[in-house]
């Protein structure tokens, strides 16, 4: 991979008011590997991808992802995520119970619970508002 396209706050490009944005993200996810590019698409709510107005594009985005990193979610959000990827009951319960820094990492058929550790220097680099 020689290029990474990162989309944070993906909800801005999704939803019934922005079908073109949802199509764009789905096409990027489908075609990125062909152009030696990786795509990182970030959102806080799986419902951004599972809403009926964008479920087709949402499934395409998840179906073409090589990796998922799922941090703690509430019950409804876990249910929404279940519309996009296969989760067993143990994984669903675990995601609801995750503490800060805990996540489910999915790579193909391999799944593992991980702990994301951040150093003080890394945390300080984000400042009090999440950025510089």
What spans do the regions from the language model cover?
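Conserved P-loop NTPase motor module
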Residues: 1, 95-132
């Amino acid at each position: 991979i020689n290029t990474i396209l990162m989309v944070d706050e993906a909800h801005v490009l999704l939803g019934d008011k922005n079908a073109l944005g949802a199509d764009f993200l789905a096409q990027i996810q489908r075609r990125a590997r062909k152009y030696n590019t990786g795509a990182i698409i970030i959102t806080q709510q799986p419902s951004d991808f599972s809403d009926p107005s964008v479920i087709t594009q949402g499934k395409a985005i998840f179906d073409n992802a090589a990796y998922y990193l799922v941090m703690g979610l509430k019950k409804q959000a876990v249910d929404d995520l279940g519309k996009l990827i296969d989760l067993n009951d143990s994984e669903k319960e675990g995601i609801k119970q995750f503490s800060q820094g805990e996540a489910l990492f999915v790579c193909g058929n391999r799944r593992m619970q991980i702990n994301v550790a951040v150093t003080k220097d890394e945390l300080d680099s984000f400042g009090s508002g999440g950025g510089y």
